[in-house]
């Protein structure tokens, strides 16, 4: 999704017209189950009846509540509760016999509601931000889907709840203590209920997040009453920073599986459930920094769309910063060498390692990656589009904070897209450039778990050149067989080739044509076909060849074709018709943001009214007279807005 850092403000959640309306309604009708294994864990849930409206298809939204101390059995001191939000959708077809996939967006710190509501979930939100329509290419067509907000404090997940005030002009956030009066609000001073915003009460890095999620899985898969599968396979699909989440989480889960199986796991009875892991899918993932950094200068200067987003001089500067003595590559190698000695588990226990690794990421981001953003004028998640870009449309951002949605979900807090506190916690230990991600992928492949890497070929943030380099850098038994496989066209349907794929057995790398960072948003049918083929043991190219067993020559299926996908070129796309949605200011020009701040903008349903938006959404913004949106005050025929923001930051969040 968008880097909620490019604009001066990060508008995250709509506030109500009155002060009290900005707090979510008290949850009602929630079923609460205490864990049968004791220890204080609980599950709470509702059937919301939202989004998935296909007749007979159930969905459940709720929380797994883990009390303080839950993670101690795996060496993590956790003196705070972890309340992890989930939204589970049955498969539309034969859910009892369907496998299950978890979906997580990245960040770190980004809500998976973005992926659910703009990429691969059962519904999309309409431009009115108040209603939804079904997604015919939803990934729950044939797979049970479990969407998670993690780590704690992301999206609708929380540690402890608190009320805050926010000054939109000074960017000051102040906690309201119990008993404090609710202050009077105006266009730039607001209140809301959120997680604590305490950096010490969220996961510090990917490894610690894996431990928390494994405990969630132990509770949910054993005790959630709405899931009774005959097919026990569990897959994980993730995106962007999921290039780290996916390998680390899945490998950690498998390590615990093996300990449980061989009797070396000494934890409680409730934590001895083997998770039948099947497939890891990574969509436009930033996997390994050392391997993928060279892809940024290439994508900016020499891509398959013939877009020179930077000139030759800037391109050379990016390469120099990468390869010169003491540059990006050397800094990452230094980070990795000292972390291997002083923090081999990558859990942030050594301050010197944290600082060195954080410094490496800061230098590399600033000098190797960011010149594209500074000089190109093009979108970070789609090189084919100029900034600002309105795609994927952010209508879901207001919908998730509508009172009727909050009530149906049974959530006690306001939803936010991205939490900068979580991002900062990961950055504080230098999580980005640390080692181990490719080794985790090799471990999964050696243990029979499929790995499917899927990359839209217009993304810059975690681009396909870097994804391809990562796929070729996985060192496992069949590395050479994978290298020897050629690129085959991805036959999406009888008339469309959706990209190119290299595959050998359980490992595939797919380049998807005409897609930015969020592949399912751009190419929903292609993404769905790749997802199904990976999970159901079919070749990615055609979906007709079984990939689970060896051929007569003793080898697994391998794709055939050219060794290099760069030979397949594209034409630059037309520009999206621009509109500004005030809850995502990366869709807005500087002038539009200023007009919202000074009250001269006319806004309906969070959309700034102009000729473009009137043409695109006449049913929403096309009426003759300005009408206040929820949470807005009509002043002299113009609208002043009550909106939430979070602290802007000088780095990019990968959604």
UniProtKB/Swiss-Prot annotation:
GO terms for cellular component: fungal-type vacuole; plasma membrane; side of membrane. It is found in: Cell membrane. GO terms for molecular function: serine-type carboxypeptidase activity. The active site is at residues 240, 459, 517. Gene3D superfamilies: alpha/beta hydrolase. Transmembrane segments: none annotated. It catalyses: Preferential release of a C-terminal arginine or lysine residue. Substrate binds at residues 462, 518. This is Carboxypeptidase S1 homolog B. It comes from Arthroderma otae (strain ATCC MYA-4605 / CBS 113480) (Microsporum canis).
